[in-house]
């Protein structure tokens, strides 16, 4: 209805503009579509525009002057009356498709602009009115381009306690670029729209969900606690599950569902596990309540989850991302090591346990890998965990190869009044010795950030077997630390044999330093000959590797397939609420 209404107004505008151009000021060349038809009095328009801008607040004045002073205060929209309606139509068409990006068209206020511009008479212009129309159109255009290029929300404002990646914002260079030439409007509108593969994949998913939003399906009844539907069994919910999977295409449609899927058969299991892989659910041979909860989620809800993650993809860090970088999706508890757009490594991670120990969203440069690190225990762990443990397990400190210091002098654990420690009184430092039992494992990855968060190995590998891995105090434990360390080393040209040999020897020294066998002939020969091989304590990374700890509940997998995961930190709701109320 809105689109039809806007089309009707635009038809009227087009007629008015055409009539004004044909009759105004005797422009005989107007029949030639290449000719330019100017406003009857450009000087009067310029003055009206200056007056209108002067009435705005300081921030808006600054932006408008950045736009119009380089143009000599001439119109961006009405500089050529032959093309004015065409440009407005082009802008309106783009706005009408904003739901393809998860943004409501109503946010831009285009309907109000069209209503206002439909009353313009360009034969005898009311220049203050024309100046107002100019700015209204400019506001819509700027809102669209800046939102698509940089996002419609500032995540640091939206998540003040969780998000600490400063993102890019529109600057004067951006303003100049989108207003540099009014004849290239379509180019600027297109350029503002993200085009990377992940964004386009999520757009396609959004489109599918838009088509399914009105689909109604029978909810699958929740099972009693500790109950599941096992493969090969008959259950009343099995045909209901089958119908739900047919809607989203994991299962081919059949009319006689009740008879074909009376039993939880292999075909249904295969389709169900495709669904579970998409939603990062545990893949097994039974149906439990977590799977049922995901199947029962309505398509409207899923639509807004995708829309929220499209917005996240529009947020770009202010600082440059190195070509080789590490991306941790805290939501999915997964790390990807990337070179450009190519994923070279994927591994599981353990992230902070909500709500008290959430891993913050951060940007930093990894500058070193520490081998066989010691662990200085955070105060919060000393006060809230170790002090309590020591009251009933006095050997805990010595058994875990920890030392206690006060004023840099080592003290015995029994000398510490553990029960008295609090946020007001905690003068002790607890350090765990390096080695295989150290909580940081054998490798620690330091990157610049204000929270002393780092990536590290662990002495407890069992956590990586768990589906849910929100278990740490905020730092990120990595499943394959040695592979990550080798990825972060300085790149070497494979055609340079000498450099490749140096790199291989460095990798061998890292292996040897953390207690693993050497693999190069040079390394093995040195050990066989009894030569001393110096163990490394740290490896400096130059020029450094970008680390991004980010949060995405909808993303693409290694093969480009769209996946979802549980919103463990409950960060979707604020963003979705903002998108729904964006006006």
Predicted regions and their residues:
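Cationic-aromatic interfacial patches
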Residues: 22-168
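Bacterial N-terminal signal peptides that target proteins for export
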Residues: 1-9
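Bacterial N-terminal signal peptides
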Residues: 8-18
């Amino acid at each position: 209805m809105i689109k039809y209404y806007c089309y009707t107004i635009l038809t009227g505008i087009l007629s008015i503009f055409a009539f004004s151009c044909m009759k105004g000021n005797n422009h005989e060349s107007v029949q030639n579509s290449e000719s330019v038809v100017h406003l009857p009095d450009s000087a009067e328009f310029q003055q009206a525009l200056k007056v209108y801008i002067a009435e705005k607040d300081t921030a808006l004045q600054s932006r408008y002057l950045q736009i119009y002073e380089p143009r000599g205060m001439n119109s961006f929209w009405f500089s050529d009356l032959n093309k004015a309606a065409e440009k407005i139509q082009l802008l309106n068409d783009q706005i009408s498709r904003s739901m393809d990006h998860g943004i409501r068209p109503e946010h831009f206020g285009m309907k109000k602009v069209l209503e206002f511009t439909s009353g313009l008479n360009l034969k005898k212009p009311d220049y203050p009115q024309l100046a107002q129309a100019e700015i209204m159109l400019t506001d819509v255009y700027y809102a669209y381009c800046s939102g698509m290029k940089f996002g419609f929300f500032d995540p640091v404002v939206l998540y003040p306690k969780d998000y600490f990646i400063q993102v890019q914002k529109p600057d004067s260079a951006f303003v100049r670029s989108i207003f540099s030439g009014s004849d290239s409007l379509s180019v600027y509108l297109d350029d503002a729209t993200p085009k990377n593969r992940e964004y386009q994949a999520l757009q396609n998913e959004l489109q599918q969900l838009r088509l399914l939003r009105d689909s109604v399906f029978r909810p699958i009844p929740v099972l009693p606690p500790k109950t599941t539907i096992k493969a090969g069994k008959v259950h009343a919910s099995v045909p209901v599950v089958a119908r739900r999977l047919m809607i989203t295409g994991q299962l081919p449609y059949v009319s006689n569902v009740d008879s074909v899927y009376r039993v939880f058969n292999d075909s249904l299991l295969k389709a169900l596990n495709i669904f579970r892989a998409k939603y990062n659910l545990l893949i097994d041979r039974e149906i439990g309540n977590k799977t049922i909860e995901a199947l029962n989620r309505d398509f409207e809800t899923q639509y807004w989850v995708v829309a929220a993650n499209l917005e996240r993809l529009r947020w770009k860090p202010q600082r440059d991302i190195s070509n080789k970088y590490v991306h941790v999706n805290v939501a999915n508890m997964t790390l990807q090591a990337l070179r450009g757009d190519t994923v070279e490594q994927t591994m599981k991670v353990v992230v902070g346990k909500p709500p008290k120990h959430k891993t913050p969203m951060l940007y930093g440069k990894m500058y070193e890998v520490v081998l066989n690190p010691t662990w200085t225990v955070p105060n919060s762990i000393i006060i809230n965990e170790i002090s309590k443990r020591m009251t009933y397990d006095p050997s805990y400190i010595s058994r875990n190869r920890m030392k206690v210091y006060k004023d840099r002098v080592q003290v015995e654990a029994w000398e510490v009044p553990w029960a008295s420690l609090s946020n007001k009184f905690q003068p002790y430092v607890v350090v765990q010795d390096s080695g295989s039992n150290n909580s940081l494992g054998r490798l620690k990855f330091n990157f610049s950030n204000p929270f002393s968060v780092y990536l590290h190995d662990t002495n407890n590998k069992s956590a990586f077997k768990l589906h849910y891995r929100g278990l740490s105090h905020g730092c990120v434990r990595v499943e394959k630390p040695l592979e990550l360390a080798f990825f972060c080393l300085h790149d070497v040209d494979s055609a340079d044999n000498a450099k490749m040999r140096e790199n291989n020897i460095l990798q061998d020294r890292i292996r040897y330093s953390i207690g693993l066998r050497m693999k190069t002939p040079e390394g093995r020969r040195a050990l066989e000959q009894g030569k001393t091989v110096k163990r490394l304590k740290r490896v400096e990374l130059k020029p450094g590797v970008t680390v991004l700890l980010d949060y995405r509940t909808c993303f693409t997998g290694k093969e480009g397939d769209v996946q979802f995961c549980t919103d463990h930190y409950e960060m979707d709701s604020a963003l979705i609420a903002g998108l729904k109320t964006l006006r």
